[in-house]
Amino acid sequence: MKVLVWTVMTYGAEGWTLRTDEKNRIHAAEMWCYRRLLNVTHKDRRTNASILEELNTDRQLYGIVVKRKLSYFGHMSRKKNLNLTKTIIQGKPEGKRGKGRPRTAYIDNVKQWTGLSAHGAFQATLDRDAWRLRTKKAVQAANTLTDEAAKK
């Protein structure tokens, strides 16, 4: 399942901007796959925690998306030339901003997961080993928060 389904589901995840509703959809899709694997329907009224316990696993899909995004961010921010992708990641496009509440930017996810400012995140990526460690901690934190939510 992880080889076939998750790779298709997370295709292009490096460029996603994740809000709470997308996070919930990722969790729901993962649980849907687990339920199909066990041939359990919602009519059976089984909790997500019991499904995860039976499979002896934790929710992992959101952590995979976090890892891909942070790895890609590190790769792009270390590039020397200033290209369009780096400009977009920095959140500095040209033109006027639209009305209403600002959309969640790519860098907002990075700041939330790493606990750094935008400038601090760009500086932290220069040391690849430290950035890998920070990415690993962010993935563990994302999976831990997900597991706690599943058990409630």
Which residue stretches match the model-derived regions?
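Short linear motifs embedded in intrinsically disordered, charge-biased segments
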Residues: 1-152
